[in-house]
UniProtKB/Swiss-Prot annotation:
GO MF assignments: large ribosomal subunit rRNA binding; structural constituent of ribosome
BP GO annotations: translation
Protein name: Large ribosomal subunit protein uL10
Function: Forms part of the ribosomal stalk, playing a central role in the interaction of the ribosome with GTP-bound translation factors.
Length: 172
């Protein structure tokens, strides 16, 4: 890799770190090419990407940013899983790590915060944005139905009481 190629690679890495909602760093030693292709496909379908980069170039890319601490994670065979959606990269990475024991999640970045392995696993257990939206809509629909029933209940009781009174008077 010549100097110009390295410069292009560093700018690509800087762009990934600055524009992604989440970035997960993982070791992939012992993972087959087919498994990496499968990971790339899953991440791409979810709107993200997977990048294998030289550790030295990653360290240069983050050296002038607030993400300098993430460079400590880049030791050995490391790759980056990234996405604009903050939940996608952690969720897919942790799921892939559960299926492939050689794939080890080391940590990552959420927005501009550096996270450890446990934090990435906790984030992976959260629902994605579509899941959160559906939960909010369900809660609104359920509560609005309860409100309508609550508002209709007194009217129904009054109508029943008047109807019973009228029936009683007609019988007398």
């Amino acid at each position: 890799m010549n100097r110009q190629e390295k410069s292009v690679e560093i700018s690509e890495l800087s762009k990934i770190f600055s524009s992604s909602g989440s970035v997960v760093v993982a070791h992939y030693k012992g993972i087959s090419v087919a498994q990496i292709k499968d990971l790339r496909k899953k991440v791409r379908e979810a709107g993200g990407g997977v990048k294998v980069a030289k550790n030295r170039l990653v360290k240069i890319a983050v050296s002038d940013t607030s993400l300098k601490g993430v460079s400590d994670l880049f030791v050995g065979q490391s790759l980056i899983v990234y996405s604009v959606d903050p939940i996608v990269a952690p969720k897919i990475s942790v799921s892939f790590a559960n299926d492939n024991k050689q794939f080890v999640v080391l940590g990552g970045i959420l927005e501009k915060d550096i996270l450890d392995q446990d934090s990435i696993k906790r984030i992976a257990s959260l629902p994605n944005i579509d899941g959160i939206r559906s939960m909010i809509i369900s809660a609104i629909q359920f509560n609005s139905t309860r409100l309508v029933n609550l508002l209709n209940a007194p009217q129904t009781k009054i109508v029943r009481a008047i109807s019973a009174f009228v029936d009683k008077n007609q019988q007398s």
